[in-house]
């Protein structure tokens, strides 16, 4: 009897980036094949070129329908978008053509999931400048998913080993982020990370909430957001039965979370969460002056479908050199499978 394995759609990311490389390397592994049935969404010619660069012994099966996939060893099933002119294809190039291709790949993988043709989605890195050059005015994957799934309440969760970070706001200016520190928004974010932790196997998650200002304002010396918005949100969350503490200064919250005191961290803005997260998940090779390995997964919460992603960028400077690490892509696929397998724990949205 064959063991059930979910079908996972993987958008390859920007065709000029390391996205195709990390995608091909990941789906070629036994680790990925053992847990799911992957379908790559992207341009088949770019992926064929990538296979040749990596030297992997793989063949491409071009498909236009999910039921045409073979899911066989040595075969990469590719939902061929035919959206890149391979004769003019250049690695590391920022362009409207590649931005449009990346955008189309993402929209297609969303469409397949919304139609229940695949069980989860994983995304490779896109270049925000290229996307916008193509006329698609989105600040990132998260906003594209929200638009094409008609989702109003959503959040970004970063996961790396025992560090789990969720943001009250993400792709807005720092000035706007301060304005978004509101009681109701913080409560919603606490609820989202509590549910997400339970879905990845943490039965009674303990949540730490960061302050916004230095030292969490030290009783109002450095700002009012803690007293007016964050503390009331925490009190309300406690009333609702959530195990939550705060506000905690970031430089205290993260060492404790890494040490296992907190199962999840709620932060107020993008860099407050991304900087410590990437310090933990990214490994810089001092001798070679390049990233040695990159781990970490981005999970979009609140969507009607599952979406995980690598938490690294396009790395245009090393695209096409066969030196990009597939670790984060493998981890993203593993989390997509894990979330799919715990759908019964889902309340509303992921």
Please provide the spans of the model-predicted regions:
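Contiguous, glycine/small-aliphatic-enriched amphipathic segments in soluble metabolic enzymes
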Residues: 1-141, 184-208, 212-268, 272-297, ...
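Flexible loop/hinge segments that line or gate small-molecule binding clefts
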Residues: 139-166, 170-173
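Active-site glycine-rich loop that binds ribose-phosphate moieties when present
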Residues: 143-152, 174-196
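Well-ordered beta-strand positions
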Residues: 158, 298-300
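Amphipathic alpha-helix from the class-I
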Residues: 170-177, 321
């Amino acid at each position: 009897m064959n063991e059930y394995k979910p079908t996972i759609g993987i958008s390859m990311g920007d065709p000029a980036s390391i996205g195709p490389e990390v995608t091909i390397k990941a789906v070629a592994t036994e680790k990925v094949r053992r847990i799911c049935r992957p379908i790559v969404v992207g341009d088949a010619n770019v992926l064929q070129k990538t296979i040749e660069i990596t030297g992997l012994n793989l063949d491409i099966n071009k498909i236009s329908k999910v039921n045409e996939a073979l899911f066989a060893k040595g075969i990469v099933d590719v939902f061929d978008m035919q959206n890149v002119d391979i004769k003019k294809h250049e690695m590391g190039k920022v362009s409207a053509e590649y931005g449009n291709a990346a955008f189309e790949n993402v929209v297609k993988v969303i469409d397949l999931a919304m139609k229940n043709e695949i069980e989860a989605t994983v995304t490779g890195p896109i270049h925000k400048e290229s996307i916008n050059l193509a006329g698609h005015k989105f600040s990132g994957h998260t906003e594209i998913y929200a638009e094409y799934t008609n989702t109003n309440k959503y959040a970004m969760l970063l996961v790396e080993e025992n560090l789990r970070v969720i943001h009250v706001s993400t792709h807005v200016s720092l000035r706007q982020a301060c304005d978004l520190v509101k009681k109701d928004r913080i409560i919603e974010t606490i609820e989202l990370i509590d549910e997400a932790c339970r879905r990845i196997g943490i039965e009674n998650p303990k949540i730490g909430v960061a302050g916004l200002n230095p030292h969490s304002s030290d009783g109002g010396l450095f700002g009012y957001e803690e007293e007016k918005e964050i503390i009331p949100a925490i009190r309300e969350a406690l009333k609702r039965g959530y195990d939550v503490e705060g506000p905690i200064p970031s430089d205290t919250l993260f060492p404790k979370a890494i040490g296992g005191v907190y199962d999840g961290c709620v932060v107020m803005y993008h860099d407050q969460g991304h900087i410590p997260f990437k310090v933990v998940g990214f490994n810089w090779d001092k001798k070679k002056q390049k990233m040695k390995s990159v781990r970490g997964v981005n999970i979009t919460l609140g969507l009607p479908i599952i979406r995980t992603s690598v938490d690294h960028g396009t790395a245009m400077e090393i695209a096409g050199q066969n030196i990009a690490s597939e670790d984060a892509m493998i981890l993203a696929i593993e989390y997509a499978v894990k979330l799919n397998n715990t759908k019964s724990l889902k309340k509303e949205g992921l």
